[in-house]
């Protein structure tokens, strides 16, 4: 199996190197990842500037390329320029810190996987729960096991798996659960400061809110030391609300 | 009604000024938009750098603020810092060029509206179909009419409306249709060039693919000179596939 690996923490981040080394024991791995950290870039792509691609001279069992862009850029270039064909699987990660609830829309890691899904490649995003104490070895070992058990070819087009792994030693992981993207979100606030020339600037801060009644909420699996596996798609239509609107509004003519 | 207006083309773009001027005839409008163009930034937010907020000294019927960040940053700062409370409505646009099909995941304009939806504000993204010949007056006039007819307070939490308006004179618009985010996407390719110091760089290009069998596909309404109105949510779980996975895999224990 040929696996394309990307991330949003940058090409030299500990998480991606741990993942690529672990996968390369069994699979052919190619890393194509951002030159610089791209956390929280969402599904940004680079249209107004060109992209530089560089093969790194690093002594590993796999090839490593850096791209002067975002995770989604890396996936596009990885497929079209580096590999010249679709890989059998794309994995984006291992992210430093979790991607649960509304994180999914901000996350560069998740967007890397969704870009693979758009391109028609079975794709997985993987994150280690704790930003302060990520345990990449646990997540990498889990992914290796998961690929034995889960038929990634069954993942439908335009859909990816969003996997979050508790930051605990591997032998404390109880297993994995199929979960749903939860309503976990942030209550934002801004810390105001004054720069040396008198201008106001602001740091974005946020408090996590976890109050989703759904027993399948992604964060609840993690709290019990299970890995959460959420299938997510690039189609955002709210079907239930669309149906209600259709009942209320016919197609409307103007005038 | 208090309306917060943002966009991704930047605070001085023609589209946002046309929208804000039109809306300010009837509503209290505050513009909080990116200092510089942020097209295709997706749902990026600025976490590693602070944000600068500046009130512009521009002679209009409404206040204009610029933020040194993304559309999602603008919405967060617009609510928490500029207004200090939730507006009654958020509108992101008018974008130069359409946001149909998979554009939705790349679009800064759409992300602005989804950020409003996360914050619990009724939110709308609006785009003029043509990048080359956008017709902002048509889109702005349509939005004014639409707000008379559509109860924005009925939009559920975590959901926004993604509106695309054909680039034709207003009297050629036939009406509006409720639509679904389509499978419209791009077949990417990269044009390789060599920089003056001998390095390779690449321009991302793409050919549009429109082959969605769904009669409610967003782009089909536009082709018939209807405005497309697609309700989209920030929850990406693929429910159908989740159900199939649940039938196949029980919650899995390791060891």
Swiss-Prot record, chains A, B:
Binds 1 divalent metal cation per subunit. SUPFAM superfamilies: SurE-like. It is found in: Cytoplasm. Its main location: cytoplasm. It catalyses: a ribonucleoside 5'-phosphate + H2O = a ribonucleoside + phosphate. Its EC number is 3.1.3.5. A divalent metal cation binds at residues 8-9, 39, 95. GO terms for cellular component: cytoplasm. Pfam families: SurE (PF01975). Its cofactor is a divalent metal cation. It comes from the Bacteria. One of its GO terms (molecular function) is metal ion binding. Keywords: Cytoplasm, Hydrolase, Metal-binding, Nucleotide-binding. Belongs to the SurE nucleotidase family. Nucleotidase that shows phosphatase activity on nucleoside 5'-monophosphates. This is 5'-nucleotidase SurE. The gene is surE.
């Amino acid at each position: 199996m040929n696996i394309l690996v990307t991330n949003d923490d940058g090409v030299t981040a500990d998480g991606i190197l741990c993942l690529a080394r672990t996968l390369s024991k069994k699979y052919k791995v190619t890393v194509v990842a951002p030159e610089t950290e791209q956390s929280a870039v969402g599904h940004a792509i680079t249209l107004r500037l060109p992209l530089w691609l560089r093969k790194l001279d690093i002594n590993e069992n796999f090839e490593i390329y850096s791209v002067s862009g975002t995770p989604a850029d890396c996936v596009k270039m990885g497929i079209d320029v580096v590999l010249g064909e679709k890989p059998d699987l794309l994995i984006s990660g291992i992210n430093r810190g979790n991607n649960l609830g509304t994180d999914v829309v901000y996350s560069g890691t998740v967007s890397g996987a969704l870009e693979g899904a758009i391109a028609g490649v079975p794709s997985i995003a993987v994150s280690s729960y704790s930003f302060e104490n990520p345990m990449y070895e646990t997540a990498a070992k889990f992914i290796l096991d998961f690929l034995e058990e889960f038929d990634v070819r069954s993942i439908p087009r335009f859909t990816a798996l969003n996997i979050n792994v508790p930051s605990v030693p591997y032998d404390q992981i109880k297993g994995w659960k199929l979960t749903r993207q939860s309503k976990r979100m942030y209550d934002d606030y801004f810390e105001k400061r004054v720069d040396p020339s008198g201008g106001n600037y602001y740091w974005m801060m946020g408090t996590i809110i976890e109050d989703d009644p759904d027993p399948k909420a992604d964060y609840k699996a993690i709290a019990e030391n299970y890995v959460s596996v959420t299938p997510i798609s690039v189609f955002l239509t709210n079907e239930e609300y669309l149906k209600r609107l259709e009942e209320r509004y016919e197609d409307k003519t103007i005038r």
